[in-house]
Amino acid sequence: MTEPQIIAHRGATYLAPENTLTAFQNAIVLGADGVEMDVQQTKDQGLIIHHDYLIDLGTEISAKIYDLTLGELEDIDLTKWNGVDFTTEKLPTLAEALAFCSGLEGCTVQLELKAPILPDPAFVPRVVEQIRASGLGERLLLVSFRHDLLQQAKELMPELRVGILTLGSLPSMMLPPPVLWKDLGLVNSMDGELDEENCPALKKQAGLVASTISDKLTLIAALYPQMSVRQIVGTLADQADPAAYVQSLSFPVDYVSCEYHTAFQNPELVNQLHAIGCKVAFWTVNTKNVVRSLLPLGPDCFVTDRPDSIRVWIAEAEAE
């Protein structure tokens, strides 16, 4: 069995601020095959590497990426992070990040397109122009939850490798996993009477579930800006069978990158996608137990926050 490619999610994020040049370099030093990064658009149509639409990374700035200019974002100081001092660290532009990774021997790049909050037909062409200029060629894979943007990129650059990101089953996403219910001591409220004695516990349980659902809804909405809830639900329903969905698309797809629980819902997923010529990545694979569960399925890639440990976990799983 071929060992999966290891892609460091936003770089080595426990050693440096995520999505920074230092995080990318550390990931390769630790043995990752490549890095994943996120590109989004600034107020003045610049292209910056950052995951969330909000500024984070422990800065004192409270603002949205799309409300700031490229220059304002480049001026944000990231030299102090988690008690560690960095000589120079800032949010890289797309051009800077691609040029840097191009110079890291053997480094592949998974570049995620973050859709602009407001429609901008020129967003994808701007990204494609910089991809061409980088010279990364087949070392770059463009991925996104917004598959219409990938289609646009593929039309502009037919040789570009693209991969669709998928979330999996909407119902299974919205509620806490069974193990969490057990760990929190939660029970099905229908198992007991709604009397005064157990109402406080049920109220606490409802609060935890509501908080989980709220967080998941916020996540989903952020992945699909410009879309209504009805449109998002329809989109996710269309993707419930990834292999059938890929075959319905009007452009060729090189990779399907799935939230890893998708494989537990359909253990034949990797085989089904391989049968139609698609490689398969799972994200975000961060524990030994998950590696042990996924490895026998034959995935082509693990996207992970733990590039320091995952090869050890793979070796241990293969030795079992």
Description of each model-found segment:
Residues 1-320:
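Phosphate-group recognition and catalysis centered on beta-loop-alpha active-site segments
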